[in-house]
Structures are given as C-alpha cells and as structure tokens.
C-alpha cells in the first residue's frame, strides 16, 4: 500500500493525525499545568540569549560505557560550545556543535566515540541534542514525579526520532535526561548549574 507524501516527508496519515489532535486540543479548556510548564521553559529558552550548564554524559554501547563531564554554553542561535572537564586524560578538549555538525579542537588528545542510534548521534553531541529537543522537539507527555517534572519529548517528528526523557527540577530547569533509541537507553545526562542567559 502506498501513501502519498507531501514535501518534507509528512504522509497523509500523519497529517490527518496531527489535524485530529489539533481539533481535540482546541476543545480543551485550559491545558495541562505540566504541559504549560514545559512550554514555558521552551519559550524562555527560545527568547533568551542562550544558556550555560555543566553536564556529565554516560554513553551506553551495551558492552561498554563511557562517562565524561563537560561545561557547555549555548548562544542565542542555538550553537553549543563545550569544554571537556573530566576525565583528566581528555580534559581541555573543546568544540562547537550546531545544526550543520561539529568541530573539535585539542592538543595531543583525541575525543573519538563510535556513533549511536544508527549514526544519528555521538556522545559529545548529547548536550546539544538536549537543548535542541527542549526548544523544538515534539512534547509527548509530562508527569509529576515527587519534586521533578518528567517530560517525554521526541527530538523530531520523523519516524526515526530519538526519545528524550527529561526531568526538570527547581525553577523547571533540566537536571537529568536520558536519550532512548528503539526503547533502549543510549545516553544519560546529569545536568547541573543550568542558567538561562
């Protein structure tokens, strides 16, 4: 069975699904407070001059894990610059990541991790993926878990989307995220000192 697609890859079935959801949401009287909080964070990030945060990333390859810590700064255009802080053997490596890719700079050190999720993401790009998803991903759900707001967000509207579970803490700022591909956690991000500029 063939489905006709519009430019950009949206099939008629997906378009119909989006229209039905939009009609149902129009009938809602106030929206979910949890969704409102998630969308408020998105609005703040989109309107801001950027943000800064520290993150510890763990990449899970199934048979092996790698953990490293980075300091990150996102500018008003969504470009993320980072510097590796730990482990000491790769500390000082820095780079920039944006929609077009990334660039690393280093002295006598190399930061090389295999690709994850069928070549969609590298561990070093995980903080940029978190920011990109918070500012423009498809919000699937939100639930309160004790003092944390747990969001499920797809990084895109595509069939091969990565799913991010994001936990917001005090001030509705991110404190943790997990990136899943085909229902398997491939990346864990522990976020500290998140500040919107």
Where are these regions (language model features)?
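Extended beta-sheet lipid-handling architectures
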Residues: 52-55, 67, 95-99, 177-179, ...
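Sec-dependent bacterial lipoprotein signal peptides
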Residues: 1-26
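N-terminal leader/targeting segments and the immediate start of mature chains
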Residues: 27-74, 79, 197
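An acidic-aromatic
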Residues: 74-129
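Beta-strand elements of well-folded, non-transmembrane domains
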Residues: 57-61, 74-78, 86-88, 168-170, ...
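Gly/Pro-enriched, hydrophobic low-complexity segments
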Residues: 141-197
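Short, solvent-exposed coil/turn segments at beta-strand boundaries
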Residues: 47-50, 73-80, 96-101, 146, ...
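Amphipathic hydrophobic-ligand
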Residues: 64-70, 89-97, 159-161, 185-189
């Amino acid at each position: 069975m063939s489905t006709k697609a519009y430019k950009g890859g949206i099939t008629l079935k997906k378009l119909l699904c989006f229209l039905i959801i939009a009609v149902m949401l129009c009938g809602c009287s106030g929206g979910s407070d949890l969704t409102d909080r998630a969308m408020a964070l998105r609005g703040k990030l989109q309107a801001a001059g950027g943000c800064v945060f520290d993150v510890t990333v763990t990449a899970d390859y199934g048979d092996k894990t790698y953990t490293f810590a980075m300091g990150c700064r996102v500018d008003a255009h969504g470009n993320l610059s980072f510097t590796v802080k730990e482990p000491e053997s790769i500390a000082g490596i820095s780079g920039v990541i944006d929609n077009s890719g990334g660039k690393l700079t280093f002295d006598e050190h190399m930061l090389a991790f295999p690709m994850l999720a069928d070549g969609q993401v590298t561990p070093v790009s995980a903080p940029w993926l978190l920011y990109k998803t918070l500012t423009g991903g498809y919000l699937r759900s939100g639930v309160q878990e004790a003092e944390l707001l747990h969001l499920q967000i797809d990084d895109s509207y595509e069939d091969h989307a990565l799913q991010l579970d994001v936990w917001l803490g005090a001030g509705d700022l991110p404190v943790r995220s997990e990136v899943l591909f085909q229902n398997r956690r491939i990346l864990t991000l522990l976020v500290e000192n998140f500040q919107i500029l």
